[in-house]
UniProtKB/Swiss-Prot annotation:
Residues 138-149 have a biased composition (Basic and acidic residues). InterPro entries: ZNF428, Znf_C2H2_type. It comes from Homo sapiens. Residues 40-61 have a biased composition (Acidic residues). This is Zinc finger protein 428.
């Protein structure tokens, strides 16, 4: 049957050698047993089996287990993460110290700095301006620009897209793309 060699002969490992004896399965393991490979009855069962294999959360059997854990579980399965905590309470206004409008005690006026939309119309000036300064109107067309600047802008509007390879100008992005593809093929 089988021989066990001494550890000195095999380098510390025991080996089994087969004799000429035919080792066929016993009567309890016939070739028609339930352990033989069988095809699933339908594609639906096959899909269900594949899903079960892919969604296992057992790290011993699932090589992608750690990735799934980082990403929040497998496909459509319930997440094992703890539910998110409620948002922390809103901080009081850094300028006046009052609670934000939604958390202010009833009857107290809202903070004009935190909630300018609900505060009375007497809102203070924004932080960027000092009191007494007026807002400047945006410059009107033709005002505040040097005369030579208009010509440069018109030139840029004609060819707003520039090739980075040869500095040619194009009216639209499609033309520039086509030109760039010519560079890529070596035709330009």
């Amino acid at each position: 049957m089988t021989e066990t060699r001494e550890p000195a002969e095999t380098g510390g490992y025991a080996s089994l050698e087969e004799d000429d004896e035919d080792l066929s399965p016993g009567p309890e393991h016939s070739s028609d047993s339930e352990y033989t490979l069988s095809e699933p009855d339908s594609e639906e069962e096959e899909d269900e089996e594949e899903e079960e294999e892919e969604t296992t959360d057992d790290p011993e059997y699932d090589p992608g287990y750690k990735v799934k854990q980082r990403l929040g579980g497998g496909r459509g399965g319930p997440s094992r993460r703890a539910p998110r905590a409620a948002q922390p309470p809103a901080q009081p206004c850094q300028l006046c110290g009052r609670s934000p409008l939604g958390e202010a005690p009833p009857g107290t006026p809202p903070c004009r700095l935190c909630c300018p939309a609900t505060a009375p119309q007497e809102a203070p000036a924004p932080e960027g301006r000092a009191l007494g300064e007026e807002e400047e109107e945006p410059p009107r067309a033709g005002e505040g620009r040097p005369a030579g600047r208009e010509e440069e802008e018109e030139e840029e509007e004609e060819g707003t897209y520039h090739c980075t390879e040869c500095e040619d100008s194009f009216d639209n992005l499609g033309e520039l793309h086509g030109h760039f593809m010519l560079h890529a093929r070596g035709e330009v």
